[in-house]
């Protein structure tokens, strides 16, 4: 009977498992009624209404509010990929149907493209598109409305539902190149919101990297921090008998930050290298499989130098001898070069393999650091300074490093060594007290590779390098180190340089040492500190009664380090300690609550995503985030307290911030009371937008930094400054110094200039992807995390009393002030009105004109501060004798006036009078033009806002010619090769027809010609020659060009042979379907035959009939290039556009190549309105995808550096793409009818060898070898040893698949070998099996086969996707290819609940039947695990892992062999059910 009761419980658990809930959570639900800690650790929570105290439960077709005290699996939620909210019990994501907003919210399949599934938190609100928020109706139904409703996580403390965001898990091994997991993913019919072990023999956690594993078969193992607490698990390797583990991720391709994040998730860090022995161990395990790998070396802390990401001291250096100063300064992340085992600096956004390291003995350094902060009273000889049982003496007789060493040794001391941050603090204070700026310390190196050692013989356990240090001086074997006063940082110096130096020796510690602090208090510097262990509210702790005289204030990183060591002895998990920082008045700025004198905030040490909100009080945290600061509720939260009091009554130094009254230099700007000046560098004034690091370097050239806001008043000023310069409707984003680049800063945000973070700049910004480590500022007081490599404008900040430097490249311009697309120059030296009219003209500007009240306000605000130069300022207005004859000096009409009343009473005068503006009132008046006054000039950049009018009326063209843009075009590509022409022959043909070779004056004409080259394989002559490439053959100037970047004018290309370099060249337009070259221009031999051509001539206007094609209405259905397009007209959102397309049995248009783009460019120009296209993003603009599933690398953005402005894309009237909010209303959409193609079955699976394989159609490919550089012959032999062949490309689909996979490796791979050979006899290229190369891609021109060197080999150049000849001895990556060899095993298909509605009775029957089967099996097995995976007699293949081989990976999951290749039901399913683009069905849930 007991067994049957247990079986009933198991039956219920089995039902939960079928619904997709994790086994462990299902077990929890059987015996707990409150949300468990395990749920929270997995990121699962229950959503509770803050006001109603009820919780959201997913029902059959609606969401309702239910009693929270009876939790079930349908109440469990989790944030998953792309900001989706996943319901564990319902196996679906919360979605909003934009087309039916009145409907209640419900669950949808998580990869649906027809429903809005993205949500974000905003002050306890759950907000979706169109500002719709999760709300509740009176019947407790959950709906979307624009009213506010607040939600919290149902826990004992009522946490925030966004405290557990979805984080990218970067996969290990597998075949996904390290790409992050996608959650949820579907496997065997079930959706999984977490990594699983099912289907994997070794029971390691794994995930898919696309939403449906069976469709793409992309997967990898999950990082698991719990897998190696005391030993190295299967994915790690151990270094001999040490307790250090290494993980070689040589098939991954990640940026430095992504690699760093991957290692951190496993409890490790990117590789640090302590010495040559460790480097030798690493080199032996790389086996030259890859060229370069990421290591933990970086200089991402703007205030420090090079460092290891795990905090290991940087004393061993092995920089490559070839490294130049440029990359060393510009690139901030380090790599290990495999062949030379030397280090290089790289752009951190490059994608490379990486190595993780984990030290199982990581606590030893923490114990040592804690001891260094303990106070010890010390006695020293006269003139020596005591500190922590040692005595120090700064000697001011300047000596070389060796001289300093001998001098100290002669006094029975050593040249100072530094073993801790506590000693750095003492060093800084000693230098300040002695008024010294720099000193020798005892660190030096006399080795190659460089290995710094202390002259005292002590171990190097701590380093503290200055920015860009340690720099290895060229041609110097001996290197010596100094320390500077400002922050104690170290620099590498020439040992012969003469500096001050510090000697160090042992001191005397008295037996009865007294710290000077009361009992129970600890001393640090001049203060005593104590922990009050009683839990109190902030009001109680800060009252002065329990913590006398006050709570702790922290002023520096040194004091913070001391506090961290102090609380480490009592800090347990989830322990907190009050400090004096607070924002109780809800001002938005955190300040110290002190008794008496105000103390400014000089330093902050926030935890990740802190400060989370305004109006709170601050605690220091214990446990895993030891020492970090967090905001808590001042009244309700209880914590211990940190107290601070001076050792004795000192004369306190004035700590009030001094406000310098020096005006800002040059054209930097500030406001009264601010200690800093700011300058906005916007696109109108600089050559290009810049990345965050480039912008910071730009500011540093002026002696400044990217802007920081040390006070809320500074942010207010910058916001007003931006409003004064730019139209508020402009979506501009500016880099500021806010960043979290420093890997040692635990993911917390900081200012690049070291200013304290005093405000909650990123309220509820929980969705901060690993790639977004820098912040941009918008003019609505909003900070947005952004990818540091993206390009933006920027703002610099400099202290008011610091004079900016002027870099050599800086071209000083008079201090013009920018305001809404115009600039203004204020001349403070008075002169007559006529003089300034001449001066403004000489400066290529106009006398000031004022066209609006806003411009009037801007001018008045500026001259108000310049009143000392004069009250009256000339403007560009004059009047004659008659009052109504008044106009601006540039001839424009007066459309805005702001006259003083006195003007109306003025007596008319025949004398000419000129107009001024008052700096006091802003009103206008008149004055004698000869009176000298200050004045204002204005220069305007004219923006064209209307199309050019047609030069003539529409005409006609001869038969066979194409009419476009009031010209006639003839595209001629003869089918008979004998009729193809030279450039001269083509020009003669065109002249004979009354025209010339084409001259292209605009992007629109270029698009028209390009669209008419679709399907052609022959390039065409156009009317340009190299002898005069600035004029067309018809004499018109070249005002538009479309040259190929790979074919620069007058520079021989890589295919050019020696005898071709001096022959005449003429221009061709490429018809190559590769979008890198489609429509591009390039030069070739004018005398070469074999090309088509394009003629043009003027239209015929003698006849009066109008060309119908150019003026008639555009039909709603158009055919082009094997596609059918439909035009939808009317105002609509992106979602409504998609719905309208589907009503026409179509999809929002995808644009796969340059030909279709050219067609749509011409079409949109005719339509005259912007139109939606099918492009959208779910990751804040990192990647955009086509809604119909099309995958193409082709893009046509207006500006690749454009700011990300929304999740959906449209095409403008020039065809260019822009992003905008999906809820915006545009005037139409472009659809295309999707052709339903029957999917071909490609049976068989990839066999397992020493490399992993990815299947495409009927073949398997090894991409792990692309990082293994070999000669052609070695690569060919390697593939043969694997039972495969070197890559041969048979068709365009295969070529697209290969490029998509290869582009994931980024810049790590440039070329791979192709299995082709050149036949010298007949000058042709053939595959190695003898078949011809029907699929080829030579780029702009085919190589000259007659002048090739003997026996060349062929590579695929990945960035352009073209083929290229290269010597066979070169070392390149390669891909092996073979037919899918393992036959698929027949299995019955599984159907998940998300695909059908299962009646309750049938479900119960199946559960009962399954229960009986499980009971029988349990009786048979007796001791077997009831949930062990059952395997029948299908002959399933279980691959064995062997991680000792660097490139040996597992790529076949057990389930791969259980595919049903004969499933006719699935094969014949309607297209609307099988295509991802049509997944918008709600998920129905069984009760």
Curated annotation (Swiss-Prot):
Disulfide bonds join 55-68, 93-110, 181-207, 195-222, 263-356, 333-348, 408-503, 480-495, 617-634, 699-796, 774-788, 840-937, 914-929, 1066-1086, 1208-1222, 1279-1376, 1353-1368. Keywords: Cell membrane, Disulfide bond, Endocytosis, Glycoprotein, Lectin, Membrane, Receptor, Repeat, Secreted, Signal, Transmembrane, Transmembrane helix. GO terms for molecular function: carbohydrate binding; phospholipase binding; signaling receptor activity. Glycans are attached at residues 97, 239, 928, 1107, 1122, 1131. It is found in: Cell membrane. PROSITE patterns: C_TYPE_LECTIN_1, C_TYPE_LECTIN_2, FN2_1, FN2_2, RICIN_B_LECTIN. Residues 176-224 form the Fibronectin type-II domain. Residues 27-1396 are extracellular. One of its GO terms (biological process) is positive regulation of DNA damage response, signal transduction by p53 class mediator. Its main location: membrane. Residues 42-165 form the Ricin B-type lectin domain. Residues 241-357, 387-504, 524-643, 673-797, 819-938, 964-1095, 1120-1231, 1256-1377 form the C-type lectin domain. Disruption phenotype: Mice are viable, fertile and without evident histopathological abnormalities. After challenge with bacterial lipopolysaccharide (LPS), they exhibit longer survival than wild-type mice. They are also resistant to lethal effects of exogenous sPLA2-IB/PLA2G1B after sensitization with sublethal dose of LPS, suggesting a potential role in the progression of endotoxic shock. Induction: Following exposure to endotoxin (at protein level). Residues 1-26 form the signal peptide. The chain crosses the membrane at residues 1397-1417. It is a single-pass type I membrane protein. Residues 1418-1487 are cytoplasmic. Residues 1463-1487 are annotated as: Disordered. Residues 1463-1475 have a biased composition (Basic and acidic residues). A motif (Endocytosis signal) lies at residues 1435-1441. C-type lectin domains 3-5 mediate the interaction with phospholipase PLA2G1B. The endocytosis signal probably mediates endocytosis via clathrin-coated pits. Interacts with sPLA2-IB/PLA2G1B; this interaction mediates intracellular signaling as well as clearance of extracellular sPLA2-IB/PLA2G1B via endocytotic pathway. Interacts with sPLA2-X/PLA2G10; this interaction mediates sPLA2-X/PLA2G10 clearance and inactivation. Receptor for secretory phospholipase A2 (sPLA2). Acts as a receptor for phospholipases sPLA2-IB/PLA2G1B, sPLA2-X/PLA2G10 and, with lower affinity, sPLA2-IIA/PLA2G2A. Also able to bind to snake PA2-like toxins. Although its precise function remains unclear, binding of sPLA2 to its receptor participates in both positive and negative regulation of sPLA2 functions as well as clearance of sPLA2. This is Secretory phospholipase A2 receptor. It comes from Mus musculus (Mouse). The lineage of its organism: Eukaryota, Metazoa, Chordata, Craniata, Vertebrata. The gene is Pla2r1.
């Amino acid at each position: 009977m007991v067994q049957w009761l247990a079986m009933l419980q198991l039956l219920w658990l089995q039902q939960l498992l079928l619904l997709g809930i994790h086994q462990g959570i299902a077990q929890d639900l059987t015996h707990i009624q409150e949300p468990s800690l395990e749920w929270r650790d997995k990121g699962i929570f229950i959503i509770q209404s803050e006001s109603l105290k009820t919780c959201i439960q997913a029902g059959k077709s609606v969401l309702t509010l239910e009693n929270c005290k009876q939790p079930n699996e349908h109440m469990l939620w989790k944030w998953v990929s792309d900001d989706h909210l996943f319901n564990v019990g319902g196996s679906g994501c919360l979605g909003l149907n934009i087309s039916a907003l009145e409907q209640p919210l419900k669950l949808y399949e998580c990869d649906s493209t027809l429903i809005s599934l993205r949500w974000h938190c905003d002050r306890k609100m759950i907000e979706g598109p169109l500002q719709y928020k999760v709300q509740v109706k009176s019947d407790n139904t959950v709906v979307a409305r624009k009213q506010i409703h607040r939600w919290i996580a149902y826990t004992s403390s009522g946490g925030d539902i966004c405290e557990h965001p979805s984080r990218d898990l970067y996969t290990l091994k597998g075949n996904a190149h390290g790409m992050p997991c996608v959650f949820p993913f579907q496997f065997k019919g079930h959706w999984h919101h977490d990594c699983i072990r099912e289907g994997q023999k070794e029971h390691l956690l794994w995930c898919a990297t696309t939403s449906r594993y069976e469709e793409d078969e992309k997967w990898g193992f999950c990082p698991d921090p719990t897998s190696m607490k005391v030993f190295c698990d299967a994915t790690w390797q151990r270094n001999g008998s040490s307790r250090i583990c290494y993980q070689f991720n040589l098939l991954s391709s990640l940026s430095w930050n992504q690699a760093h994040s991957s290692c951190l998730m496993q409890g490790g860090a990117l590789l640090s290298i302590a010495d040559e022995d460790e480097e030798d161990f690493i080199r032996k395990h790389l086996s030259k499989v890859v060229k370069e790998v990421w290591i933990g070396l970086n200089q991402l802390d703007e205030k420090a130098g090079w460092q290891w990401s795990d905090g290991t001291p940087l004393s061993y250096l092995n920089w490559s001898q070839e490294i130049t100063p440029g990359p060393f300064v510009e690139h901030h992340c380090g790599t290990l070069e495999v062949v030379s085992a030397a280090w290089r600096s790289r752009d951190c956004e490059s994608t490379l393999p990486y190595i993780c390291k984990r030290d199982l003995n990581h606590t030893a350094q923490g114990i040592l650091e804690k001891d260094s902060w303990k106070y010890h009273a010390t006695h020293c000889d006269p003139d020596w300074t005591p500190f922590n049982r040692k005595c120090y003496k700064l000697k001011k007789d300047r000596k070389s490093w060796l001289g300093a060493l001998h001098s100290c040794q002669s006094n029975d001391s050593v040249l100072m060594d530094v073993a801790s941050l506590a000693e750095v603090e003492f060093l800084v204070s000693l230098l300040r007290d002695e008024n010294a700026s720099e000193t020798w310390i005892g660190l030096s190196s006399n080795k190659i590779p460089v290995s710094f050692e202390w002259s005292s013989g002590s171990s190097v356990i701590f380093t503290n390098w200055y920015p860009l240090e340690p720099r290895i001086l060229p041609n110097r074997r001996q290197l010596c180190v100094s320390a500077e006063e400002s922050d104690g940082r170290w620099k590498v110096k020439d040992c012969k340089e003469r500096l001050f130096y510090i000697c160090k020796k042992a001191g005397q510690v008295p037996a009865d040492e007294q710290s000077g602090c009361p009992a129970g208090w600890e001393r640090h510097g001049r203060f005593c500190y104590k922990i009050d262990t009683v839990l109190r509210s902030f009001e109680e702790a800060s009252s002065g009664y329990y913590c006398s005289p006050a709570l702790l204030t922290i002023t520096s990183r040194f004091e913070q380090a001391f506090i961290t060591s102090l609380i480490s002895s009592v800090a347990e998990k989830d322990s907190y300690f009050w400090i004096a920082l607070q924002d109780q008045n809800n001002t938005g700025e955190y300040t110290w609550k002190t008794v008496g004198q105000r103390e400014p905030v000089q330093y902050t040490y926030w935890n990740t995503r802190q400060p989370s909100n305004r109006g709170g009080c601050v605690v220091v945290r214990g446990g895993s985030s030891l020492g970090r600061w967090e905001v808590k509720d001042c009244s309700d939260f209880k914590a211990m307290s940190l107290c601070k009091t001076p050792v004795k009554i000192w004369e306190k130094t004035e700590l009030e911030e001094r406000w310098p009254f020096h005006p800002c230099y040059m054209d930097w700007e500030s406001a009264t009371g601010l200690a800093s000046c700011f300058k906005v560098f916007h696109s109108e004034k600089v050559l290009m937008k810049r990345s965050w690091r480039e912008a910071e370097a730009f500011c540093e050239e002026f002696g400044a930094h990217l802007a920081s806001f040390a006070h809320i008043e500074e942010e207010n000023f910058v916001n007003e400054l931006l409003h004064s310069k730019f139209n508020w409707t402009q979506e501009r984003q500016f880099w500021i110094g806010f960043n979290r680049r420093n890997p040692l800063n635990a993911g917390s945000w900081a200012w690049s200039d070291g200013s304290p973070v005093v405000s909650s700049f990123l309220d509820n910004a929980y969705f901060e992807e690993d790639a977004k480590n820098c912040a941009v500022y918008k003019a609505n007081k909003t900070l947005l995390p952004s990818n540091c490599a993206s390009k933006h404008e920027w703002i610099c900040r400099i202290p008011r009393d610091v004079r900016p430097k002027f870099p050599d490249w800086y071209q000083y311009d008079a201090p013009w002030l920018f305001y809404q697309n115009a600039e203004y120059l204020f001349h403070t030296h008075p002169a007559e009105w006529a003089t300034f009219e001449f001066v403004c003209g000489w400066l290529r500007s106009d006398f000031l004109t004022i066209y609006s009240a806003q411009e009037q306000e801007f001018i008045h605000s500026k001259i108000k501060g310049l009143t000392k130069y004069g009250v009256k300022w000339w403007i560009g207005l004059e009047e004659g004798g008659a009052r109504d004859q008044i106009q601006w000096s540039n001839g424009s009409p007066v459309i805005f006036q702001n006259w003083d009343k006195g003007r109306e009473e003025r007596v008319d005068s025949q004398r000419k009078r000129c107009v001024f503006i008052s700096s006091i009132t802003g009103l206008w008046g008149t004055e004698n033009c000869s009176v000298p006054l200050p004045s204002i000039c204005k220069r305007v950049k004219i923006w064209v806002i209307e199309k050019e009018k047609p030069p003539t009326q529409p005409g006609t063209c001869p038969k066979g010619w194409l009419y476009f843009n009031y010209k006639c075009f003839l595209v001629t590509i003869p089918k008979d090769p004998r009729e193809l022409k030279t450039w001269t022959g083509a020009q003669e043909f065109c002249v004979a027809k009354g025209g010339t070779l084409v001259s292209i004056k605009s992007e629109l004409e270029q698009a028209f010609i390009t669209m008419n080259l679709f399907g052609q394989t022959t390039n065409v002559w156009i009317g340009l020659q190299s002898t005069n490439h600035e004029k067309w053959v018809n004499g018109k100037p070249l005002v538009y060009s479309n040259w190929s970047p790979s074919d620069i004018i007058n520079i021989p290309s890589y295919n050019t042979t020696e005898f071709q370099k001096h022959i005449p060249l003429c221009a061709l337009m490429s018809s190559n379907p590769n979008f890198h070259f489609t429509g591009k221009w390039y030069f070739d031999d004018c005398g070469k035959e074999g090309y088509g051509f394009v003629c043009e001539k003027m239209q015929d206007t003698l006849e009066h009939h109008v060309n119908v094609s150019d003026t008639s209405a555009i039909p709603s259905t158009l055919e082009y290039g094997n596609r059918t397009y439909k035009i939808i007209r009317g105002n609509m959102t992106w979602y409504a556009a998609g719905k309208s397309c589907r009503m026409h049995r179509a999809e929002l248009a995808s644009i796969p190549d340059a030909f279709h783009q050219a067609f749509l460019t011409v079409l949109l120009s005719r339509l005259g309105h912007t139109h939606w296209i099918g492009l959208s993003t779910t990751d804040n603009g990192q990647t955009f995808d086509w809604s119909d599933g099309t995958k193409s690398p082709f893009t046509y953005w207006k500006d690749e550096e454009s700011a990300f402005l929304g999740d959906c894309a449209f095409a403008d009237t020039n065809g260019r793409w822009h992003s905008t909010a999906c809820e915006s209303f545009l005037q139409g959409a472009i659809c295309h009818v999707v052709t339903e193609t029957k999917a071909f079955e490609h049976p068989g699976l990839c066999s397992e060898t020493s490399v992993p394989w990815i299947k495409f159609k009927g073949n398997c490919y090894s991409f792990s070898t692309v990082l293994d550089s070999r000669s052609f012959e070695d690569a060919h032999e390697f593939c043969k040893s694997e039972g495969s062949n070197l890559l041969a490309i048979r068709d365009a689909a295969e070529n697209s698949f290969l490029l998509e996979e290869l582009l994931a490796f980024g810049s790590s791979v440039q070329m791979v070998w192709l299995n082709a050979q050149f036949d010298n006899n007949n000058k042709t290229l053939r595959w190695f099996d003898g078949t011809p190369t029907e699929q080829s891609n030579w780029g702009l021109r085919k190589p000259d086969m007659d002048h090739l060197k003997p026996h060349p080999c062929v590579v695929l150049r990945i960035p352009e996707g073209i083929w290229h000849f290269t010597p066979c001895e070169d070392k390149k990556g390669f891909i092996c290819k073979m037919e899918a060899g393992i036959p698929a095993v027949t299995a019955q298909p599984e159907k998940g609940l998300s695909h059908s509605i299962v009646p309750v009775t049938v479900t119960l029957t199946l559960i009962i039947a399954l229960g009986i089967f499980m009971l029988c099996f349990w009786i048979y097995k007796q001791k077997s695990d009831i949930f062990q995976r059952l395997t029948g007699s299908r002959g399933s293949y279980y691959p064995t892992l062997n991680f000792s081989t660097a490139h040996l990976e597992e790529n076949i999951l057990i389930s791969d062999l259980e595919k049903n290749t004969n499933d006719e039901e699935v094969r014949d399913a309607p297209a609307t059910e099988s295509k991802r683009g049509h997944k918008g069905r709600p998920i129905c849930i069984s009760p």
